[in-house]
Amino acid sequence: MGKGVGRDKYEPAAVSEHGDKKKAKKERDMDELKKEVSMDDHKLSLDELHRKYGTDLSRGLTPARAAEILARDGPNALTPPPTTPEWVKFCRQLFGGFSMLLWIGAILCFLAYGIQAATEEEPQNDNLYLGVVLSAVVIITGCFSYYQEAKSSKIMESFKNMVPQQALVIRNGEKMSINAEEVVVGDLVEVKGGDRIPADLRIISANGCKVDNSSLTGESEPQTRSPDFTNENPLETRNIAFFSTNCVEGTARGIVVYTGDRTVMGRIATLASGLEGGQTPIAAEIEHFIHIITGVAVFLGVSFFILSLILEYTWLEAVIFLIGIIVANVPEGLLATVTVCLTLTAKRMARKNCLVKNLEAVETLGSTSTICSDKTGTLTQNRMTVAHMWSDNQIHEADTTENQSGVSFDKTSATWLALSRIAGLCNRAVFQANQENLPILKRAVAGDASESALLKCIELCCGSVKEMRERYTKIVEIPFNSTNKYQLSIHKNPNTAEPRHLLVMKGAPERILDRCSSILIHGKEQPLDEELKDAFQNAYLELGGLGERVLGFCHLFLPDEQFPEGFQFDTDDVNFPLDNLCFVGLISMIDPPRAAVPDAVGKCRSAGIKVIMVTGDHPITAKAIAKGVGIISEGNETVEDIAARLNIPVSQVNPRDAKACVVHGSDLKDMTSEQLDDILKYHTEIVFARTSPQQKLIIVEGCQRQGAIVAVTGDGVNDSPASKKADIGVAMGIAGSDVSKQAADMILLDDNFASIVTGVEEGRLIFDNLKKSIAYTLTSNIPEITPFLIFIIANIPLPLGTVTILCIDLGTDMVPAISLAYEQAESDIMKRQPRNPKTDKLVNEQLISMAYGQIGMIQALGGFFTYFVILAENGFLPIHLLGLRVNWDDRWINDVEDSYGQQWTYEQRKIVEFTCHTPFFVTIVVVQWADLVICKTRRNSVFQQGMKNKILIFGLFEETALAAFLSYCPGMGVALRMYPLKPTWWFCAFPYSLLIFVYDEVRKLIIRRRPGGWVEKETYY
């Protein structure tokens, strides 16, 4: 944290270029931020503090000095994260990835039209129309995607309420409330319960002060703050309070040591906003796909350009061919299909409580192979709950379920009544007003987490605590402090059969036991002998080992003769007994796991996803929760477990024998990257405890080095750098801090880890369905492009026009392609390993070979069959067509003879040609029926999957209706050059459609019968 600490170590050798310098500086700054928090203010004595900051420790700074510092350091505010200007976002949608390919297509069309317009007297307008339509497609889908993202980002308009509005400072001995942005380094600040800490403070005096650091360190318990230096690590010491955490109770004074971006919170926010998010896997896939399509298009275009020149076409004609082939290869409708598919999934996920901020993140979640999850609030319920009691020398289990449906215990025992009385009276937590109608567990409580847990437990078991406190009036109390480690209060006893005053005490179990000489067993006091002390010790160790926070409880009836009615109890100079008390029992609390989490973790495991817990909490608690939710599965041991079982020192155990592993933050700090890689590689079940935000980031980078796609979940500010660095960051909608929501790609509206698993399933499904959509869309490229190629090579009249191609890509194929996004998952979706982004591509060789090489070729054969049938019916036999093109297209020749010697004028010839375009188009529609049905599944038979997808059935009818409309609607001959066709011509394609269906069903059958065989390797996409 020190300004400029260790800068010199990082100075690179003279960097020549300005750009390199900038990059080097950015990397250096990031390294600087990734280092652990370095500050030494917590080690300084008050004198040294006074010397360092020039502050009078009782009167504060002078207003003049404060103004100077404010001018030097700037306001005490976080720099808002850099936002991308809206026009840049819009341009990204218009010119990114796939759109670029369509723009190139459009420009080439305009170019071709320009060439034709310059060289022909009456140029055809096909290319002009095509260029206009392509531009329109890009602009419309671009606007659509931009609108989607803008809608999501509106939900994210926060971060502003991170900064506290007012702060109480002491300047020149006067208390004044000022805007928190005007607080400067060296200011003397006072905070009380309920305030937000306005800057990083070094505490110089405190009274019962506790702060909630959960958003920074992930610890759910409020932390005591005092002037004492208690730990080398500034995040753990008691005498530093951090900017933007909350003071829960008590009061404190402190000197401001850092403000704004230099605070610990500021560094984390800067760290998060400075990280490069990187490209999403689906964006990389689409880029890879564009490379393939562009490669194929350019290769074919150039090959046929050269071929045309060899076949003695003019170079102008050759250029027109080149452009035609490239454009025919571009699947115009696919950009819209992909955008719509992702949007549909995002909407479906929002219904399941996952809000996706970035459309492409939908798929990323599906390819996730490692989830680094925060513990508090994500895996657990984020409410301390009483878990166990130890009284009458036995452990009782309490009900920790969210809906109180679990086990209960005997509530009539005299010891339990005494224990519940102490827990209710020696407790400062109270329910907030007007909540009588709410269930007890849902009520808001003023007080710390442990006391709230006790309050709710006693209210559930024994009725109103408020009434109990009214009956037993409180006379005096000594609040909990870190030196004594106990809390004590004395109450009037309404029960006349017992002494008038009851002293109750709770605190750290070993401290409480030391003050006791007897113990309550079945309502009777017994001397506390060694045997009972051992029983206590065993119970304490057992509950502590479960990761629970244990408190001890004792009481004492004060004898009436020494403490008569009206006795003045003095808590400063204590005039009542604090020893020889009667020990009543232990109560332990834990933040229990959420009910749905163990099942979700199990699903992750069967889907091949590794779940790693990363928490700021204590290792024992972390390990207990990890075992509770199945992150460490039953029977798997850590190195410590093996050492305990074999009764040998930990150092003698081979770490690789242990499948599970709990790593402490302090050990992680000293590890090299190689050691961390070793842990991540050789242990399947890992828990990182007591980690700092910087370490979370290092863990994520370690997982990414292993080639994992990492999802990070968390709700605190401490999770945001890791969340930003991960492939997908998941923030909590309810408990999440604004900084973490800012950095995330997805927000769980119900804060439940189980929703992530739903997300993973949806992500995998969308990847499968996108593959199916692409396979469907690409297949029709072959029957669209082969007519063009045969037209050039064999010199026959053009079988299919450019405008007709557009009618397929943007008309008949659109709805069916989108309908595949609604297809249900195949049975193996959550049983297979996560996809490997390096090898499992969205568009792979197998998909191209199936779409282009096999199904596409059958479709093209069907098209040509129809074409030759119709021309033969009109008198032109196939053999007669070869080499006919030059005369056919010459508008000055009006006596071209057919196979039977009839003469055809230019106009008549063109009508026959366009009449052929329409059946060729209809044939493609008919064979695409079969293609759509076979694309429903990749491995299962269509008969297994069924036809439950209503949108797909609608798609089949829609494409048929559209084809019929385009063929038979009056005026289409002029607009699109489509002519009505005889009903019999529809049936030419049926055998080919059936062939496609049978061929693919047989292929899938072989894949299922012979997994891993040749057919699967070559054709399973």
UniProtKB/Swiss-Prot annotation:
Its EC number is 7.2.2.13. The gene is ATP1A1. Residues 107-129, 307-318, 791-800, 865-916, 969-983 are extracellular. One of its GO terms (biological process) is establishment or maintenance of transmembrane electrochemical gradient. InterPro entries: ATPase_P-typ_cation-transptr_C (IPR006068), ATPase_P-typ_cation-transptr_N (IPR004014), ATPase_P-typ_cyto_dom_N (IPR023299), ATPase_P-typ_P_site (IPR018303), ATPase_P-typ_TM_dom_sf (IPR023298), ATPase_P-typ_transduc_dom_A_sf (IPR008250), Cation_transp_ATPase_P-type (IPR050510), HAD-like_sf (IPR036412). It comes from Sus scrofa (Pig). This is Sodium/potassium-transporting ATPase subunit alpha-1. Residues 594-715 are annotated as: Mediates interaction with SCN7A. Residues 1-5 form a propeptide. The keyword Phosphoprotein applies.
